[in-house]
């Protein structure tokens, strides 16, 4: 019996020891599990620290290259660095928040870098402003692009208004505003504005500025104001002589070139009576070159009349200016003065040319004055009733070119021979 009791007690003790051992084993396993979690957590923090370090380095690289090279390559390098960190980090929510903080830090560093770059640019601008030379010393177009230019062998006369450039011989891209670079002549010939010193010591010693002429009395070169009552013929752009007119001198060409040659051939005869043309021009406010050009067209300045005692057109017209008593209704008044006299030139300028110009003003009041003058020249040949339009005013005149030929000859006398 005692033996049985001793055996039971031994078995109970063993069972108790086994229970204690099992409980201790479970507790040890739990502690081991807790140690592994702590170890993994510690390992994760180390990964985060390494990733944070990589991010800071990448942010500095991005800032440096952003200043010198641009953002494209830097973003690729930064993405590679982020990839390396991501492979070891895992995808925890807390780690993503850590990444967000690092990114904000990188952006702050980049903004700081941009501030430094702006500061360096400000220093460069400050050094530039300290220089004694202004930016105008380095940039800006030439003061006068028109000066020194030439076209078809003609040098420029400078920048003027387009309507003042004779024959519209200009280039409109070399001058400021609406001015053009002219290569012929300034038919307006406006007086220059006087130049006043910027800081005169005694303003009372400055000469008075010259008077500026009214726009309606502005004159062309070689055009005294006494010749400008009926418009400026130098503003006209005549077509010149027809081929039929050019055949008088056996010319193989027509136009303004032919008119120039015809009046050049008459110059010696015209110069014999130049004083007569000048006086008639002053008396009736018409340029003497226009009067002489009519004489050149009518009788070649008188060359055709020496052998006919002053008669032309088959004996119907008389004198250098060719007064047709029948067609004009003047009768014997046409022969009141010798055919080659100054009185004859003055008379025909008055009672025929000036009379027809004034009739043009009444018939075509809306025409510019220089076209009314040209219409009067056309009427000198074919009558006032024949002048209907500006473009067709020579239709029906001798060879259909009368005023275009006469005006071209007159302009030649002014431009080439100083009339």
From Swiss-Prot:
Biased composition (Acidic residues): 76-85
GO cellular component: extracellular region
Subcellular location: Secreted
Segments forming a coiled coil: none
Annotated tissue distribution: Component of the acid-insoluble organic matrix of calcified layers of the shell (at protein level).
Entry annotated with the keyword Secreted: yes
CDD domains: GEWL
Source organism, top-level taxon: Eukaryota
Annotated segments matching region Disordered: 74-152
TM annotation in the entry: none
One Gene Ontology molecular-function label: lysozyme activity
Keywords: Secreted, Signal
Residue stretches of biased makeup (Basic and acidic residues): 86-130
Biological-process GO terms, alphabetical: peptidoglycan catabolic process
Endpoints of the signal sequence: 1-16
UniProt similarity note: In the C-terminal section; belongs to the glycosyl hydrolase 23 family.
Name listed for the protein in its UniProt record: Glycine, glutamate and proline-rich protein
Organism: Lottia gigantea (Giant owl limpet)
Lineage: Eukaryota, Metazoa, Spiralia, Lophotrochozoa, Mollusca
